């Protein structure tokens, strides 16, 4: 492997900004903000909007927002049904 071309890979704490859930993972991302983890060490903190803790696919709480379809629009326009 060539030296000096690979990014620094280190432990980072990710926090879900909508639920407050935190998890420790390895990443090349870095932050000036740090947080003390359960093991007593301080790690960089990266805030993210969506994680598996808040994403509808993983939580099973999906919201189906469906606009009127073409058939419904046609029926409304011509007074059918």
UniProtKB/Swiss-Prot annotation:
The keyword Ribosomal protein is annotated on this UniProt entry: yes
Pfam family, one: Ribosomal_L31
Keyword Membrane: no
A single GO BP: translation
InterPro entries: Ribosomal_bL28/bL31-like_sf (IPR034704), Ribosomal_bL31 (IPR002150), Ribosomal_bL31_B (IPR027493), Ribosomal_bL31_sf (IPR042105)
SUPFAM superfamilies, per the entry: L28p-like
Gene Ontology terms: cellular component: ribonucleoprotein complex; ribosome
MF terms in GO: structural constituent of ribosome
UniProt entry keywords in alphabetical sequence: Ribonucleoprotein, Ribosomal protein
Similarity annotation: Belongs to the bacterial ribosomal protein bL31 family. Type B subfamily.
PANTHER family listed in its UniProt record: 50S RIBOSOMAL PROTEIN L31, CHLOROPLASTIC (PTHR33280), LARGE RIBOSOMAL SUBUNIT PROTEIN BL31C (PTHR33280:SF1)
Subunit structure: Part of the 50S ribosomal subunit.
HAMAP family in the record: Ribosomal_bL31_2
Protein name: Large ribosomal subunit protein bL31B
Organism per entry: Limosilactobacillus reuteri (strain DSM 20016) (Lactobacillus reuteri)
Lineage of the organism: Bacteria, Bacillati, Bacillota, Bacilli, Lactobacillales
Gene this chain is encoded by: rpmE2
């Amino acid at each position: 492997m060539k030296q000096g071309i690979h990014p620094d890979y280190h432990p980072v704490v990710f926090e879900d900004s909508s639920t407050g859930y935190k998890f420790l993972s390895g990443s090349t991302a870095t932050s000036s903000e740090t947080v003390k983890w359960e093991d007593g060490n301080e790690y960089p903190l990266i805030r993210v909007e969506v994680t598996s803790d808040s994403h509808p696919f993983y939580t099973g709480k999906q919201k189906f927002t469906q606009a009127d379809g073409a058939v419904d629009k046609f029926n409304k326009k011509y007074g059918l049904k």
